[in-house]
UniProtKB/Swiss-Prot annotation:
Organism whose genome encodes this protein: Shewanella baltica (strain OS185)
Enzyme Commission code: 6.1.1.5
Protein name: Isoleucine--tRNA ligase
Entry's Gene Ontology molecular function annotations: aminoacyl-tRNA deacylase activity; ATP binding; isoleucine-tRNA ligase activity; tRNA binding; zinc ion binding
PANTHER family: ISOLEUCINE--TRNA LIGASE, MITOCHONDRIAL (PTHR42765:SF1), SOLEUCYL-TRNA SYNTHETASE (PTHR42765)
Quaternary structure and partners: Monomer.
Keywords for the protein's UniProt record, in alphabetical order: Aminoacyl-tRNA synthetase, ATP-binding, Cytoplasm, Ligase, Metal-binding, Nucleotide-binding, Protein biosynthesis, Zinc
SUPFAM superfamilies per the UniProt record, alphabetical: Anticodon-binding domain of a subclass of class I aminoacyl-tRNA synthetases, Nucleotidylyl transferase, ValRS/IleRS/LeuRS editing domain
Length: 940
């Protein structure tokens, strides 16, 4: 054997079987950085059509989690695949750097601004803290193999970006969308600030649910509206609320104009009383009040009670009954307690009737000193006292604990309140912003498409956007307001540009350091500087202008794609849409793609308390980033993305299949020089031409899947190709030819050429997903090439050639099916100990006429396809009783152990072994391959 071993073309490669990714990937990253890989990619696409994916900035606080990884990897896959398609696709990562979470972290270290530290010093500490957080997150993102301009990211706290955010606000003002108003807004008493819609989370909370009677100022007149004359008992309207603390701010009772209301009389505790309730809710209400018998005295429409007065249950004034479309009969009494200072619907209907917007509650959630009964009490703690006072005043009909969904602060996880405060708003309707935004939504492609209806509903129903915050660390609302009239300075837009120029040089502190006289001169005494800061959603929502329109690498090209988690419909997608539409009359994006949240194997959210958190850092240190990237790509991101150790281990198994395929390809390209050894597709052995044709068709499918952002389809097709067409068929068949054919002969070079073309294509297919592995493969491929696969385009060398004499794809598919049947029978023979390996087998195929014609077409080469030493085809009618039936009605099989001698070199059992004097242990084919011109293969 040792004499002939050196005549074989044994596979050889430096590409290791084990990826050892956790150790090797950091080494590759060092090389990428040293070589300036990102800039190489940029240089390779100068002058090409731009594709702009704008990075939604993560918040610069804390370590990245698995959701961050999903987001950044998806973006990286898109950028790399678009680059492979020839686009100039820059990637500028960004960070959101202002806002409350950073303030809270800094407060823990240095205290609140204005106490131990000045506001200016506090802002500087916030800036330092955010920079530290950015550096930590940046290293983690780079470790994932995400390529981008990491040395020049955009930060919302960059002086230039802060200045451009101010400029964006000035354009919104110039377009007439800004107004100041006293409105109820989401208010966190722990933050002491208004919250944006996106900063509100809904959690279950137990609240006191109470039914409260408001006695009519003139009961006799109210009863008369029900057709009851001369009524002598008190008549009350009843409200139901879960916020007793808002009753001091009650200024009306709202009814539905077309709803039927009943006047219901009953006796309880010796007292006769009459209540007004929605007709459809009478039974449920009286059950709550433990009323066993009652009389309905009459019925009337809600419209009959407009402006009728009712006494406040514990304050010394009366309130009107008013009409509103927001009144429903889903729960309660059909009559709504209306406090314009503590509810959006209440405020809107209150404006219609000119009601006072009462706000007895301070920033900290404590009643103001002039609040009767409850001064100095925190609103949530006052609930019990309100209930007790109502009971004392005989106005309480029912009181129970009620579990319901209630808004909470996203940061403190504590219940929030609605509270009327003076704030700055972007109006949804004054200048048609809502209408135009809805039109722009229709012009945008939403992926998945349900995203469109989701954001449409949000835009249809959202209130004006409160953009002001009472915080220290944020971009200032750089406005001057007249001290007497509260009007904006008439030259606000040009003044804002002058302020922006200063911020560009000195950062946001320039506003607080600014003496108004420097800009306003003699007018300075008439105006005051606004001290509010912008909602951070304005910061990130304006980056299409403050960043994309400003940075040269974007070439002034609009944004093609926004890609974030599905929570961003009400967050970044919404704020960007509002600002862009207000500024430019159009959406800032052409496509919006959303991905689902990550959950564990049981569908639960990641939670430290549950102990099911999977940190990306742990995954990369143990399995490698390419395993994490493969999991992301292989998961359908349109729904929840399930991840667990078991799932990641399955990804590692799938990765090994791809790696082993790549290793086989590289090992069998040993000694192949494309410049001199490449066989034209037209001249290849038929099977080689078929596999190149399959690869060419697959490449089109893969490119299409990348273009549609269906990365799970890419991985499915890639795995199918590696496992079935290559692994179970082509690579299995060509091993014999590759190892035993004459080294320089056509049979081997044809095979190597096919392997080379597939390798060139496949390394590009996997590069957007398995970036580290693709780079590793690229460095070992034969032939002259650029330094990195990432500067390449999809491979053009795959030719889909079909000669007139060629066997069709259907033919090879049929042969694959036949081979699978043969393998089953051989495997059974091995289990029965009738043969060892498949080369010990002689197989007889009993086939019908049509199949016989196909099988005999390739003559003696059929045995190479079946991996047997002999393959005979006989008529189906000649099948013996020992022949095994298959899943093909046209085929029966008989396997026998070969009686011929085994060739020492190729291991085939052939009759001629022992008959060649010079090489008594070889078959004729092997002698031809080592001494002659080499065997001729036409088909396989």
């Amino acid at each position: 054997m040792s004499d002939y071993k050196f005549t074989l073309n044994l596979p050889e490669t430096e590409f290791p079987m084990r990826g050892n990714l956790a150790n090797r990937e950091p080494e590759m990253l060092e090389r990428w950085t040293k070589d300036g890989l990102y800039q190489q990619i940029r240089d390779s696409r100068i002058g090409r059509t731009p594709f702009i994916l704008h990075d939604g900035p993560p918040y610069a606080n804390g370590s990245i989690h698995i959701g961050h990884s999903v987001n950044k990897i998806l973006k990286d896959i898109i950028i790399k695949s678009k680059t492979m398609s020839g686009f100039d696709a820059p990637y500028v990562p960004g960070w959101d750097c202002h806002g409350l979470p950073i303030e809270l972290k800094v407060e823990q270290k240095v205290g609140k601004p204005g106490q131990k530290i000045s506001a200016a010093e506090f802002r500087e500490e916030c800036r330092k803290y955010a920079a530290e957080q950015v550096n930590g997150q940046r290293e983690d993102f780079i470790r994932l193999g995400v390529l981008g301009d990491w040395q020049n990211p955009y930060l919302t706290m960059d002086f230039s970006t802060e200045a451009n955010i101010v400029r964006s606000l000035s354009k919104v003002i110039e377009s007439g969308h800004l107004h100041k108003g006293v409105k109820p807004v989401h208010w966190c008493t722990d933050c002491g600030s208004a919250l944006a819609e996106a900063e509100v989370e809904y959690e279950d909370k137990t609240s006191p649910a109470i039914d409260v009677a408001f006695v009519a100022a003139d009961s006799k007149a109210v009863a008369a509206k029900f057709g009851v004359s001369g009524y002598s008992h008190p008549v009350s309207m009843v409200i139901w609320t879960t916020t007793p603390w808002t009753l001091p701010a009650n200024r009306a009772l709202s009814l539905s104009p077309e709803l039927d209301y009943s006047l219901v009389e009953f006796e309880k505790d010796g007292v006769t009383q009459a209540l007004i309730l929605a007709e459809v809710l009478v039974e449920s209400c009286l059950t709550r009040y433990n009323v066993e018998s009652h009389t309905v005295l009459g019925s009337a429409k809600g419209a009959a009670f407009e402006l009728v007065r009712f006494n406040h249950p514990f304050l010394d004034f009366d309130v009107p009954a008013i009409l509103g479309d927001h009144v429903t009969t889903d729960a309660g009494t059909g009559i709504v307690h209306t406090a314009p200072g503590h509810g959006q619907d209440d405020f809107v209907v209150g404006q219609k009737y000119g009601l006072e917007v009462a706000n007895p509650v301070g920033d900290n959630g404590v009643y103001k000193p002039d609040t009767e009964y409850f001064a100095g009490q925190h609103v949530f703690k006052a609930n019990d006292n309100v209930v007790a006072l109502l009971r004392e005043k005989s106005a309480l009909l029912n009181h129970v604990a009620y579990r319901h969904s209630y808004p909470h602060c996203w940061r403190h996880k504590t219940p929030i309140i609605f509270r009327a405060t003076p704030q700055w708003f972007i109006s949804m309707d004054n200048h048609g912003l809502r209408t135009q935004a809805l039109k722009e939504i229709e012009q945008t492609q939403w992926i998945p498409d349900w995203g469109q209806s989701r954001i449409e509903k949000m835009v249809e129903n959202r209130p004006d956007w409160c953009i002001s915050r009472q915080r220290t660390w944020g971009v200032p609302i750089t406005l001057f307001v007249n001290r007497e009239t509260e009007e904006l300075h008439s030259d606000s837009v040009s003044l804002m540009e002058r302020v922006a120029s200063r911020i560009e040089q000195q950062g946001i502190q320039a506003w607080w350091d600014l003496d108004a006289a420097e800009l306003l001169g003699d007018e300075a005494e008439q105006y005051r500087k606004v001290t509010d800061t912008l909602d951070v959603w304005f910061d990130s929502g304006s980056t299409f202008s403050s960043v994309v329109a400003a940075r040269p690498e974007f070439h002034g090209h609009g944004v093609d794609l926004y890609l974030e988690g599905s929570d961003q419909h009400r967050g970044w997608f919404m704020s960007s849409l509002m600002i862009s539409t207000a500024m430019n009359g159009k959406a800032p994006y052409k496509q919006v793609l959303t991905h689902g949240f990550t959950v564990d194997g049981k569908g639960r959210k990641m939670s430290k308390s549950i102990g099911n958190v999977i940190a990306p850092q742990t995954v990369t240190n143990k399995l490698g980033a390419d395993i994490l990237r493969l999991w992301v790509a292989a998961t359908d991101y349109s729904g929840e993305m399930t991840v667990s150790d078991e799932i990641l281990n399955r990804s590692a198994d799938a990765y090994r299949r791809i790696r082993n395929t790549a290793r086989f390809l590289l090992a069998n390209l040993n000694g192949f020089e494309p410049a001199k050894d490449l066989v034209a597709v037209e001249d290849m052995v038929a099977l080689d031409r078929w596999v190149v044709r399959r690869a060419a068709a697959l490449q089109q499918e893969i490119i299409e899947a990348y273009e549609q952002y269906n990365f799970h389809i890419v991985t499915q097709k890639l795995m199918q190709f590696c496992s079935v067409e290559l692994g179970s068929f082509y690579l299995d068949i060509i091993k014999d030819r590759q190892y035993t054919a004459k080294q320089e002969g056509h049979a081997r070079r044809s095979c190597q050429s096919a392997l080379y073309l597939i390798s060139e294509a496949m390394v590009r297919w996997i590069a957007p997903i398995l970036s580290f592995t693709a780079d590793e493969v690229w460095q070992l491929l034969p032939g002259e090439r650029d330094a990195y696969v990432f500067t390449q385009e999809w491979y053009q060398g795959l030719k889909s050639v079909t000669l007139a004499t060629d066997l069709s794809d259907d033919y090879w598919q049929q042969l694959l099916t036949v081979r699978n049947e043969v393998n089953k029978v051989i495997e059974q023979a091995r289990r029965d100990k009738r043969i060892g390996g498949s080369l010990e087998a002689e197989v007889t195929l009993f086939a019908d006429a049509a199949l016989t014609e196909q099988l005999t077409h390739i003559g003696d080469e059929l045995r190479f396809v079946l991996l047997t030493s002999e393959a005979k085809v006989l008529p189906l009618a000649d099948a013996t009783s020992e022949a095994v039936e298959t899943e093909l009605a046209s085929l029966k099989l008989l396997v026998a152990s070969s009686t011929a001698e085994k060739c020492e070199r190729c291991w085939h059992h052939r009759e001629e072994v022992g008959t060649i004097e010079a090489h008594p242990t070889l078959c004729t084919r092997c002698v031809t391959n080592i001494e002659g011109d080499g065997e001729v293969r036409l088909f396989a």
